[in-house]
């Protein structure tokens, strides 16, 4: 696609192409490395500076800690039990399990990415960082600028823009966002839970774009103070809501978990109701 669009020249040596598509650090779980970023590095003399070596070791150790210590431990000892049988646990326990999964999946994906980036540095190659504190995002649009950055930028450049992006009016832009995230859900797996996950994110992105348009806020404009705090809380909990469907292949399990969690909020509302004097 990049060659067709004229962004890179066709490769003259087949060995460069084979090396690019088979470069092992990023094959398992990313980051997605583009040819125009990687191929020029092949042609440079191999050089690993002391800074690159130190940073590479740090990222590998940090990634292994995230994956093997945090993610795997939380998954085996906490998250799996609750997600597999949500009705056996209280609403609070289900909510804690959901928070645990949010941490687990972040440490899992970002851990793999850190390891890949670290190994690449030891071999003399630079990959872009793939996660940028995504749970600090104050909007769903900001979340997708921080979460799995190589995937979100790939979806933007090769699906969203190819569908027309924002070039054909507001309605078409919102529809393109929903279609892009729908296909992004299918990219994770051809099952209904991933489709729902992608659709939820697509609709949320479209609604946020519409809200930005209505309120006159500019692209990339950051909120501050208490407004940002509320934005972070709302965005995080929306993302967690979507994780329920991402994690559960069984829709019934997802609905059971939502019911259990919903009882927590119902009980809080009941407690907060003022008592009537008799």
Identify the residue ranges that each predicted region occupies.
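Membrane-embedded transmembrane alpha-helical bundles that form the catalytic cores
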Residues: 1-269, 276
């Amino acid at each position: 696609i990049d060659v067709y669009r004229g962004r890179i020249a066709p490769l003259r040596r087949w060995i460069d192409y084979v090396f690019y598509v088979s470069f092992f650090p990023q094959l398992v779980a990313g980051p997605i490395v583009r040819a125009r970023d990687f191929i020029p590095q092949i042609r440079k003399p191999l050089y690993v500076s002391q800074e690159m070596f130190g940073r590479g070791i740090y990222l590998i150790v940090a990634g292994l800690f995230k994956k093997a210590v945090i993610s795997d431990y939380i998954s085996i000892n906490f998250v799996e039990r609750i997600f597999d049988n949500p009705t056996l646990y209280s609403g609070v326990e289900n909510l804690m399990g959901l928070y645990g999964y949010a941490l687990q999946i972040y440490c899992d994906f970002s851990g793999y990415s850190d390891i890949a980036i670290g190994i690449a540095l030891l071999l003399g190659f630079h990959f872009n960082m793939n996660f940028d504190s995504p749970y600090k995002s104050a909007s769903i649009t900001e979340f997708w600028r921080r979460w799995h950055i190589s995937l979100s930028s790939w979806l933007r450049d090769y699906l969203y823009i190819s569908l027309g992006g924002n070039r054909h009016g507001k309605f078409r832009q919102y529809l393109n966002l929903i279609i892009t995230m729908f296909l992004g859900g299918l990219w994770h797996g051809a099952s209904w839970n991933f489709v729902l996950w992608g659709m939820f994110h697509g609709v949320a992105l479209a609604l946020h774009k519409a809200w930005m348009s209505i309120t006159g806020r500019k692209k990339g404009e950051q909120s501050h103070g208490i407004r940002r705090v509320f934005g972070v809380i709302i965005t995080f909990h929306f993302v967690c809501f979507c994780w329920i469907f991402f994690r559960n292949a069984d829709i019934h399990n997802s609905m059971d978990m939502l019911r259990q969690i919903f009882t927590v909020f119902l009980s809080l509302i009941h407690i907060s109701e003022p008592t009537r004097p008799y």
